[in-house]
C-alpha cells in the first residue's frame, strides 16, 4: 500500500503575483525536502496543483500538514502573525495500491491515485479543505468524521500557529527548539500550541498512523 497526496491552492487566482511566486517557490522547496529526506516523489502542475507519492503511507498525514503549514505561514510581519493566513491549500490523501508508476506522476495509475484525485474534487463540493480515504470502509468512516473535525480546527489557525506546526513536522520535537528557531520565548510557543489545538492534531496523527499500520498487516 502507498499513499498519494493531491492538493491545490485555494482561490489562487486572487493572490497577488508576489505572494503566488513565494508560495510556489516554497512548495517546490518542500517537495524537494520530502524527496531528499523521505524518498517521496513530488510533482506540480499548472502552478497551483501538486501531487506527492510516498511508499510510507503512515507518514502521509505528517507530509500533508507540513505542506499546509508551509503555505499558511507565508506572509505577515511581526505585527500581524496573530492574523489569518494569506494563503491556504486543499489536500486529500488517498491510500491504496499503485498499479503503474511511470517517470511522470501524471501518467501513473492505481487505487491511491484514483482515491486522492476524486477525494480532492469531493472536498470542493463539501467545502472542506482536508480529507483521507483508503481501501477499508471502517477506516474511511472514521476518517470522514475525524477530518471534518480537524478541518474545523485548522481553519482557525493563525500565521503564528502555522509556524509552530511547520517546524514541529520538520522534526523539531521540543518547544525550546522551535522557540530558538522562531526567535521567541518557549512560553510563546507553548501558548501557540494550545491555541492551535495541537493536542487534537497530535491525537489525530497517532490514530491515523495506528489505523494505517493495522491495514498493512
Residue ranges of model-derived segments:
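Regulatory and interdomain segments flanking nucleotide-handling catalytic cores
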Residues: 1-217
Amino acid at each position: 500500500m502507498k499513499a498519494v497526496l493531491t492538493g491545490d491552492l485555494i482561490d489562487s487566482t486572487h493572490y497577488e503575483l508576489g505572494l503566488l511566486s513565494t508560495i510556489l517557490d516554497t512548495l517546490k522547496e518542500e517537495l524537494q525536502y520530502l524527496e531528499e529526506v523521505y524518498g517521496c516523489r513530488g510533482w506540480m502542475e499548472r502552478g497551483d496543483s501538486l501531487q506527492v507519492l510516498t511508499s510510507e503511507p503512515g507518514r502521509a498525514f505528517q507530509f500533508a500538514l507540513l505542506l499546509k503549514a508551509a503555505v499558511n505561514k507565508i506572509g505577515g510581519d511581526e505585527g500581524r502573525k496573530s492574523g489569518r493566513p494569506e494563503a491556504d491549500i486543499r489536500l486529500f490523501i488517498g491510500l491504496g495500491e499503485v498499479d503503474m508508476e511511470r517517470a511522470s506522476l501524471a501518467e501513473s495509475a492505481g487505487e491511491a491515485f484514483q482515491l486522492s484525485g476524486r477525494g480532492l474534487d469531493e472536498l470542493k463540493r463539501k467545502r472542506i479543505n482536508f480529507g483521507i480515504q483508503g481501501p477499508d470502509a471502517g477506516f474511511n468512516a472514521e476518517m470522514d468524521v475525524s477530518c471534518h473535525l480537524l478541518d474545523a480546527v485548522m481553519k482557525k489557525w493563525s500565521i503564528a500557529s502555522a509556524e509552530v506546526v511547520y517546524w514541529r513536522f520538520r522534526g523539531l520535537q521540543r518547544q525550546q527548539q522551535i522557540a530558538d528557531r522562531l526567535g521567541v520565548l518557549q512560553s510563546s510557543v507553548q501558548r501557540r500550541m494550545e491555541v492551535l489545538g495541537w493536542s487534537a492534531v497530535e491525537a489525530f496523527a497517532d490514530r491515523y498512523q495506528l489505523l494505517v499500520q493495522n491495514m498493512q498487516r
